[in-house]
């Protein structure tokens, strides 16, 4: 199931509660929203014009969505700075932590470096305040 700071539908459509009730783990794919949560497209918006494949046609990568998600990227960067890590690692850490063992993240990686960075997200421990701040910003803009 898709699950990220930008796609939280499983929290609203009953899937999460059903999984909890039946002790089923949800495997969250696209926990970085196809790379949108790493902040690169916000820092360099022209990168959107170089997208290929299906991402080229995804509404998530339209200029209007890049602007709409900027507050979340700003919060991810702020928390990442405090933890001396990356926004992507903070976004992954949130997915890993927010529902405990009920959700497992499977981020994609196209390079060894990305895979290593993704794995490092398991070391990041967000405080309740940080989780709350991410929740507040995320809930204002996420798919529900």
What is each PLM-predicted segment?
Residues 1-143:
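Beta/alpha (TIM)-barrel catalytic core signal, keyed to glycine-rich beta->alpha loops juxtaposed to Asp/Glu
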């Amino acid at each position: 199931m898709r699950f990220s700071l930008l796609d939280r539908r499983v929290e609203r459509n009953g899937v999460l509660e059903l999984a909890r009730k039946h002790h089923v783990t949800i495997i969250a794919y696209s926990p970085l929203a196809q790379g949108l949560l790493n902040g690169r497209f916000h820092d360099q918006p022209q990168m959107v014009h170089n997208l290929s494949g299906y991402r080229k046609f995804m509404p998530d990568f339209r200029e209007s969505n890049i602007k709409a998600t900027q507050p979340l990227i700003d919060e991810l960067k702020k928390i990442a700075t405090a933890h001396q890590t990356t926004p992507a690692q903070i976004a992954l850490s949130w997915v890993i932590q927010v529902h405990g063992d009920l959700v497992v993240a499977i981020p994609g990686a196209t390079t060894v470096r990305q895979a290593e960075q993704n794995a490092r997200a398991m070391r990041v421990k967000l405080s309740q305040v940080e989780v709350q701040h991410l929740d507040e910003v995320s809930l204002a803009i996420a798919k529900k």
